[in-house]
Structure formats: C-alpha cells, structure tokens
Regions:
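A short helix->loop->beta-strand "cap" motif at the edges of active sites that frequently abuts
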Residues: 128-132
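Generic structural signal for well-ordered alpha-helices
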Residues: 117-122, 153, 157
Length: 200
C-alpha cells in the first residue's frame, strides 16, 4: 500500500511540475510573437532655428526637429532671430549624444551685422560638444527683407564659415519661403543628408 501511494505521489508531482512548466512556455511564446506597434527614432542630428526649419526637416532623411511644435525647448520657432536662438540654446541642457546641429537662422533679423553669431556658435559647441555644425542660408526679397541683397546674405553666412560652421548650398534664396514644396528645400535637405552621412 505504501509503495502504491508513493508511486501515485510521484506521478502527481510530475504532472503538477509539467503543468507549471508549460504555462510560462505558452506565455513566452505569445510575448515573443508580438510585433511592436511603434518606431524608435533617435534624434541625433537636429535642425534648429526659425519657421523655415521644419520645411528642411520635411525633406531630410537624416536630420530632424527636437519637437514638431516650435518653442524654446524645441530650439526652433517661427518669427525668431539669431539672438532668440542663442538664448534658447543657452537654456538647453548639455547633450553629448547629438552628432550634428544645423542652424536655419538669419532671415528674421534681416541678416544683421549686429547678430551675435560668435555667441551662438560658442554656446552651441558647449551644449553639444560632439556635434558637427552646419548652417542653412535664409531667404530674402520678401516682407522686411525686400531690399536685402545677396551680398549682405553672403557676408552674413561667411561669418559662420569663419567659425568652422559648414555653409550648406543652395540658399533658400530670393523668394517667399513659406512653401514646403519649394525645390530648394529638397536640394538643401539632400545636401545636408550627404554631409551627415559622411560624419565620423
């Protein structure tokens, strides 16, 4: 009788153990076949500046906005000039993961010789110490910039270049810029992507 009881006890333990073992296997199978419903985007190459900034981001495959909504924390906002951007970057936290920063700035300040380009570049290097720096040339010939000449624009961005910032061609140019489908936005984005792809 004791022998029979021992056999039944062992069989019962084995059955319970198998049931306990199989249950997690079933759950694990369900988890492993579940497809994630999100895409992880690394924002390591960022565009910052004024209202023309998202138009370049639209066509770029390598560069993106920190946030689609313009604000100080997003480092871009419509109607803003270089000195606003310098303050926004100053208030931004240190980020060593950013690989490149592209400025799209100058238009709203009418490419003023008084803009503190040195200050903007220096604080950007402090906040993003591992980043390559690029700049997009703005637009003129419209609104408050109707009398601005290409010579003024060239001189403005030459100041960036003198500080080690790569100037991207072509400029947005002499046009009303608030049209995402302007061909120059596509060309600028393509040339920017080429530069980013060559980063080491």
């Amino acid at each position: 009788m004791r022998f029979l009881f021992s056999i039944l006890f062992i069989v019962g333990i084995t059955f319970i153990s198998n049931e306990s073992f199989n249950q997690p296997q079933y759950k694990l199978h369900i988890i492993s076949t579940t497809t994630p419903k999100y895409t992880l985007i690394f924002k390591n190459n960022i565009l910052i500046g004024d209202s023309q900034t998202p138009f370049i981001a639209k066509w770029s495959t390598n560069a993106t906005l920190l946030n689609k909504v313009g604000s100080e924390s997003s480092l871009w906002k419509g109607g803003q000039g270089l000195n606003w951007l310098k303050l926004a970057v100053t208030n931004y936290k240190l980020d060593t993961l950013i690989q490149s920063v592209t400025f799209c700035i100058g238009t709203n300040g009418r490419f003023s010789s008084k803009d503190d380009i040195i200050g903007l570049v220096n604080i950007t290097k402090e906040r993003f110490p591992n980043a390559y720096l690029y700049v997009v040339q703005g637009s003129w010939g419209w609104g408050g910039n109707v009398n601005v000449t290409k010579e003024v624009v060239d001189a403005y961005y030459k100041r960036f270049n003198g500080l080690g910032v790569e100037v991207i061609n072509p400029p947005i140019g002499k046009c009303e810029p608030h049209n995402v489908n302007l061909p120059q936005y596509k060309e600028i984005a393509k040339n920017l992507d080429t530069l980013i792809s060559a980063q080491k």
